[in-house]
Amino acid sequence: DNHGNRVEGKYDNNVRMMLTGQVFAIMSGTADEKQVQAVCESADTYLYDKDAGGYRLNTNFHENKFDLGRMFGFAYGEKENGAVFSHMTVMYANALYQRGFIREGYKALQTLADTALDFDTSRIYPGIPEYFNAEGRGMYAYLTGAASWYMLTLITEVFGVKGSFGDLVLEPKLVKEQFDDDGNAGIRLEFAGNTFVIR
C-alpha cells in the first residue's frame, strides 16, 4: 500500500488476493511453471465467480483501505474493487496461453464471452464491457481495451497465427469445445497484404 505494507496474503483468516500482480508475474515469465499452476489454483479458489462473469479483480478485503489507490472508493463488486474487470481477465488469459496453460486460459476467455452473451444476466448488448459487477451486469460497453486484447489473444494464442520475421507461423492452442460439430474451426485474416482462411 502507500505505506509500504504487504497487501496480499492471509489476514485474520481472510485471504487477500489481487489478479493484477499475478497476471504480470505470469506474463513477464517471472513466475515459473509451478508458481503459475499455484496462481491458477488460487485464482480459481479465491477470485473466480462464474455468476459475476469470471475472475474478480480482487477478493473482499472487508475494510475501507484508502491507502491503496482508488479501489476502495467503490463498494465491493464495483469497478476496481472486486468487479470482473474484463481487461485484466483477458490479459490473464493471454498470459496463461503464452505459458502453455491452455485450458485455464480458455476458461477465462469463455466465461467472459458466456456472460456477455447472456443478456438476462449481463443486461448489455453483446460485447465486452469494462467490467461485470457483483450481479454479472455488464457496465460501460465502450470504455475498455479488453476487446482488442481479446482479439489479439484469439488470433495469436488460441488460433496461434503469428508473424515471425515476415513469415506466417501457426501454433494453434484450440480446445475441443472450440470446434463445430463437423470438427472444424477457422479464422480469416490479413497478413502481409494477403487474405488467409485458416481451418
What does each of the following model-derived ranges do?
Residues D1-R199:
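Acidic, mature catalytic/reactive cores of soluble proteins
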